Regions:
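Bacterial N-terminal signal peptides
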Residues: 10-19
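Sec/Tat signal peptide C-region and signal peptidase I cleavage site
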Residues: 19-25
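Solvent-exposed loop/turn segments at secondary-structure junctions
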Residues: 43-47, 77-81, 110-115, 138-142, ...
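Serine-dependent carboxylesterase/thioesterase catalytic core
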Residues: 42, 87-187, 242
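Short aromatic-enriched loop/helix-cap "lid" or pocket-rim segments at secondary-structure transitions
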Residues: 52, 144-149, 219-225
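Bacterial N-terminal signal peptides that target proteins for export
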Residues: 1-10
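Active-site catalytic motif of lipid deacylating hydrolases and related acyltransferases
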Residues: 29-105
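C-terminal catalytic-base region of ester-bond hydrolases, centering on the histidine
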Residues: 198-302
Length: 302
């Protein structure tokens, strides 16, 4: 009996030494446990929660956390100037950095969230603390949709349109002193190409990468019907697009490609790429897309 106990004790001791060693040798079993925490930055027209009910990123944070990622979600005004959003983002970014104690953070932005984060990095001094900037469907060269919308509003009515939108966003979304009109101007192609980009250069030491999304087909009864007016405008002026941003405009830094879902689908639109509406896009799994993105950052040492 004593001999059996000794054998069992010895085996348990060996297992206790062997199992951690195997884990160490094989590395983490998680795909998305990046070296630096991930910070998500939402786009124009919404905050971290749409109408205070629907999560902007839907199931993406959960998918990342399930694979070991440390994820933080920032929230700025839905409608405001790029600079105002950048300032608000900077404040939250530094708070996250302080809480985590991390030397740097990885930024993943969508839509306007790719632009105001660039402003915060290059012009507001965040670049020493940013490991990577991943852009998802970002209007880096503006959008013809913004050009058209701004262009059709008569100068005499700009104040009325702007004030009306500001009231809506302050009342429904809880924005603080929003500036909808300026947000529209900041997304126009002339401003982005001639003013913003020349004054917002990429910073050395920050890894920049980007993805675009693309709608392949459009019909009144299609599930992407909400872009039935904007998709053809962009198609005419800029070519392939996701309903709000063209593939060309979305390219920034290391362009990783265009997500258009499986062959049998209508494509991947500007909302699908962040798991909307409500996490259902035939032929596209947003959770997997972002986990793979994080896994790639991990492999690159970020």
């Amino acid at each position: 009996m004593k001999f059996q106990k000794a054998v069992i004790t010895g085996l348990v001791f060996i297992l206790l030494l062997w199992i951690p060693g195997m884990a160490f040798a094989g590395g983490s079993s998680y795909k998305a446990d990046t070296k630096y925490p991930i910070v998500l930055a939402h786009g124009m027209g919404a905050s971290a929660e749409i109408l205070g009910i629907v999560d902007y990123w839907w199931g993406i944070p959960g998918a990342l956390r399930d694979e070991g990622a440390t994820v933080y979600i920032t929230s700025v005004n839905g409608m405001d100037s790029t600079r105002n959003k950048a300032n608000a983002f900077k404040t939250q970014f530094l708070q996250i950095k302080a809480v985590t104690g991390a030397a740097k953070l990885n930024i993943i932005g969508h839509s306007h969230g790719t632009v105001y984060t660039r402003d915060a990095i290059s012009n507001l001094g965040l670049y020493p603390y940013v490991a990577s900037h991943s852009s998802i469907a970002g209007p880096h060269r503006g959008s013809a949709v913004a050009d058209v919308v701004v262009g059709i509003v008569p100068n005499s009515l700009e104040w009325l349109v702007g004030d009306t939108l500001d009231f809506i966003y302050a009342f429904l979304f809880g924005d603080t002193n929003p500036n909808s009109l300026q947000n529209g101007y900041d997304m126009t192609r002339p401003y982005m190409i001639n003013t913003f980009n020349p004054n917002t250069p990429n910073k050395s030491g920050v890894y920049y990468q980007s993805w675009a999304a693309r709608i392949k087909t459009m019909a009144v009864n299609a599930r992407n019907w909400y872009f039935i007016a904007t998709w053809p405008i962009l198609l005419y002026h800029e070519g392939a697009n996701d309903g709000l941003v063209s593939v060309t405009s979305a390219q920034w830094g290391n362009f990783r490609g265009t997500e258009d879902a499986s062959w049998y689908s209508a494509g991947c639109d500007h909302l699908n790429i962040v798991d909307q509406l409500f996490g259902y896009t035939p032929g596209f799994d947003a959770g997997t897309f972002y986990v793979d993105l994080a896994a790639d950052l991990k492999a690159r040492g970020y």
